[in-house]
Structure formats: structure tokens, C-alpha cells
């Protein structure tokens, strides 16, 4: 097993102007980035980064700074499979040459981190790629973009970093993997940390959800306890329907049956046949009730896979004209799936869950969860009901979004799968 260094060492190194190596989830990019604070950028640091990485140097910033500096998205529809939020590229307007040298790029990076700079201080396009970090950092999105901003903040520096992927020295056509990254870090006296450890550190030292209320909820599936939560970042309210006894945040909640269900007004409340959300919610409540112990976490703000109710209705309009559920979102300039599960993970941890059997047909829900102190011991398939209205939708989820719906074509609309 690869040895990782402490988060405390990495933060101290960032504060001192050194670079660190940060690796992400093996089910995500499974790559390591060199990261340092943008305000500490020097020609030597940039040259070192260029030598050992792909050379596509990016500067993660928080959203407020992106807005202040006039940095719109590089492309209106973000099609990056990991949702990396690239903005327009820039160079410093004054004091540099062509913009590509290590000295020039270091100057641009420092200017991006300077709170007194403005949009007028940059030319576009340029040789440095700013990125917009998700508010909430790695607790909302377990990416290198957010890790860089978090590390800078934790080091009491401006929330701006510099990142680039480290290239393998064994096979220069590919990126370095964890074992090689450990050797690289040791050779150059750099700290090696994982985003999972950074998430765990922040989760231990910070809190981003608050428990508001708890009440008994009798349902047709049985009796549950509804535990209400509020996200501190955006004030969105979520509900965990708990069956049986859970141990609380300091207990041993292992192998708990869990469904993380995304809000769907049309399917859950109106009984729309265009999706399978309503039947999945009913099935999850029934399965947890029969288990006698478990959680159905109802995530608000996930309507239409995170695009919102009105955008979802607009997407339906495009689907009526022939687009599928993925293309409809993209045609609206929206991601195919804009959901994040960081807040949901914090709620599950607050309920005392340490490991779970996850009720889902979507393998992507597993990505990044380990970093929240949660282990998925089993993925439990959900029963679905296909019908004439949602059969195409289900096939699109299987074929284009990776949902595990093997054998869907063998069933006629209306039969239980």
C-alpha cells in the first residue's frame, strides 16, 4: 500500500512556497498533480512543473475571483467528463514577453492570485488556464481543482493554486500512477497526499451541514424517522428517512442499506411515466423497511440531475422533438449530470454510517465516496419498471450514462425488471 504524508505537512509546504503531489480517487482520474500556491509562483517552480508534467498548467480560483477577473467558461457547454470548469485562457497584460516562458507564466499566476488585480490586467487568450473551483472545495467535488484552492486557504494564502498532471517517467505516453508518484515525491523531497485524506481532514475539522429536526413519519411502507438537514453553503434542505436504530456520529454504522435519491417532483409527486424516479423511491423505501435498518436520503437540489425544474421541463420539450435525455441537457448548455454528493456524504456520516450497501443502478455514485470516510461494501441493484414512456430514457441511461441495466431490451414496456 502506498504511503501518504500528512495533510499538516502538505499545508506547511504550500505555505512555505513548495509544491506538493496530490492524487485523486482511483475510480476517477487516478492521476497525481503537482500543486503549489499561485501567489508563491516563481520561474523555478513553474520550470520544475513544466519539466515533469504535461505542461498544461492551470490556475484554480474560487468563483468570486473568477467573476471579479471576468473569466467566463472556455465553452458554454462543459463536456469534460469530470466536470473540470475551464475558463478562458489569459496572460498578464504588462511586464511579460510572449507569455509562454516560465517567468512569464509565473507572473501571470501571481497576478491571478493578487486581490488588487482586475479583468483589465489580463489579455485573452493566453498561456495560463484558470479553472473555477466548486464552492465548498473537495467536500463538494473531489478534484485537483478544489484541492488546490483548499490547500491554499488552509495555508492562509489567497484561494488560488497552480496544478498540472505528472507524466510517467517509465512510460512517457501515460500519466504517473500512485506507486511511481511516491518515488517521485521522495526523490524531490515533496509531500504526497491523497484527495481522500484531504476530504477526511476537512470533514474531521469542519462541518458543512447542520441537523435541524427529527420527527416520526409513518408511511405505507412502514414507520421511519425523518431527519432534516440544511446545507451551510447554499441553505438547501435535505431529508434522511431512517428506519431502525443508527448509532450516531461516534458509533459503528456498518453495512447499512442506503439509497441516495435525487429529488424529482415530476416522478416522485406527480407520478410521471417519463422517468423511473417514483418507482425507485417506492422500491427503496420498501426495501429499507423490509431490511429493518437503513436510510433513504432524499437530496433536494438534484431536480433533473441537478439542472433544476424549469430546465428539466425545457429538456422534456427538446425530448418531445427527438433529443434523448443527455443531448437535451447539452443543447440547453447544461451538463448531462450536474449532481454532487458531497453534502449527502456528510449527512450519512452524521447519521453514523461508516459502510453501506448502496441501492443504485448507477456505478458513478461510488466515485469519491471513500474520501468521506464511507465505504461501499456492496452495490445493490434497484428494481425498475419500464413502460412505453420511459423505455427510451432507460436505454439512454444504460448506453450513454453507464447505468447497470443489463437485459433491458429483453423486457417489453410495462414488465418488472
UniProtKB/Swiss-Prot annotation:
D-ribulose 5-phosphate binds at residues 28-29, 33, 141-145, 165. The record marks 127, 165 as: Essential for DHBP synthase activity. Pfam families: DHBP_synthase, GTP_cyclohydro2. Zn(2+) binds at residues 264, 275, 277. Signal peptide: none annotated. Its cofactor is Mg(2+); Mn(2+); Zn(2+). GO terms for biological process: riboflavin biosynthetic process. Mg(2+) 2 binds at residues 29, 144. Residues 1-204 are annotated as: DHBP synthase. Gene3D superfamilies: DHBP synthase (3.90.870.10), GTP cyclohydrolase II (3.40.50.10990). HAMAP family: RibA (MF_00179), RibB (MF_00180), RibBA (MF_01283). This is Riboflavin biosynthesis protein RibBA. The gene is ribBA.
Amino acid at each position: 500500500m502506498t504511503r501518504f504524508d500528512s495533510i499538516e505537512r502538505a499545508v506547511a509546504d504550500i505555505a512555505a512556497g513548495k509544491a506538493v503531489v496530490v492524487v485523486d480517487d482511483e475510480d476517477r482520474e487516478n492521476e497525481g498533480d503537482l500543486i503549489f500556491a499561485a501567489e508563491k509562483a516563481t520561474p523555478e517552480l513553474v520550470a520544475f512543473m513544466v519539466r515533469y508534467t504535461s505542461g498544461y498548467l492551470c490556475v484554480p480560483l474560487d468563483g468570486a475571483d473568477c467573476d471579479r477577473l471576468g473569466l467566463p467558461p472556455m465553452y458554454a457547454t462543459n463536456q469534460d467528463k469530470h466536470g473540470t470548469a475551464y475558463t478562458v485562457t489569459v496572460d498578464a497584460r504588462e511586464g511579460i514577453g510572449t507569455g509562454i516562458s516560465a517567468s512569464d507564466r509565473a507572473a501571470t499566476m501571481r497576478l491571478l492570485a493578487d486581490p488588487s488585480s482586475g479583468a483589465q490586467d489580463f489579455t485573452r487568450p493566453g498561456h495560463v488556464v484558470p479553472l473555477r473551483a466548486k464552492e465548498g472545495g473537495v467536500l463538494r467535488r473531489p478534484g485537483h481543482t478544489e484541492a488546490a484552492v483548499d490547500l491554499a486557504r488552509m495555508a492562509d494564502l489567497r484561494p488560488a493554486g497552480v496544478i498540472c498532471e505528472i507524466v510517467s517517467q517509465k512510460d512517457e505516453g501515460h500519466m504517473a500512477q500512485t506507486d511511481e508518484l511516491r518515488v517521485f515525491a521522495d526523490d524531490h523531497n515533496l509531500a504526497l497526499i491523497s484527495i481522500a485524506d484531504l476530504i477526511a481532514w476537512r470533514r474531521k475539522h469542519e462541518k458543512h451541514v447542520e441537523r435541524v429536526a427529527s420527527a416520526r413519519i409513518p408511511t405505507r411502507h412502514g414507520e421511519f424517522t425523518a431527519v432534516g438537514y440544511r446545507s451551510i453553503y447554499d441553505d438547501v434542505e435535505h431529508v434522511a428517512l431512517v428506519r431502525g436504530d443508527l448509532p450516531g456520529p461516534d458509533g459503528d454504522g456498518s453495512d447499512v442499506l442506503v439509497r441516495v435519491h435525487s429529488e424529482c417532483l415530476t416522478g416522485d409527486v406527480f407520478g410521471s411515466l417519463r422517468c423511473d424516479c417514483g418507482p425507485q423511491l417506492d422500491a427503496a423505501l420498501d426495501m429499507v423497511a423490509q431490511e429493518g435498518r437503513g436510510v433513504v436520503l432524499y437530496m433536494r437540489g438534484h431536480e433533473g440531475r441537478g439542472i433544476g425544474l424549469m430546465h428539466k421541463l425545457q429538456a422534456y420539450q427538446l425530448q418531445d422533438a427527438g433529443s434523448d435525455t443527455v443531448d437535451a441537457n447539452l443543447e440547453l448548455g447544461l451538463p448531462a449530470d450536474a449532481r454532487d454528493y458531497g453534502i449527502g456524504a456528510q449527512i450519512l456520516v452524521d447519521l453514523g454510517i461508516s459502510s453501506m450497501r448502496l441501492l443504485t443502478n448507477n456505478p458513478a455514485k461510488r466515485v469519491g465516496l471513500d474520501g468521506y470516510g464511507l465505504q461501499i461494501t456492496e452495490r445493490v441493484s434497484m428494481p425498475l419498471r419500464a413502460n412505453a414512456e420511459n423505455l427510451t430514457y432507460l436505454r439512454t441511461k444504460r448506453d450513454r450514462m453507464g447505468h447497470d441495466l443489463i437485459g433491458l431490451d429483453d423486457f417489453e414496456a410495462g414488465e418488472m425488471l
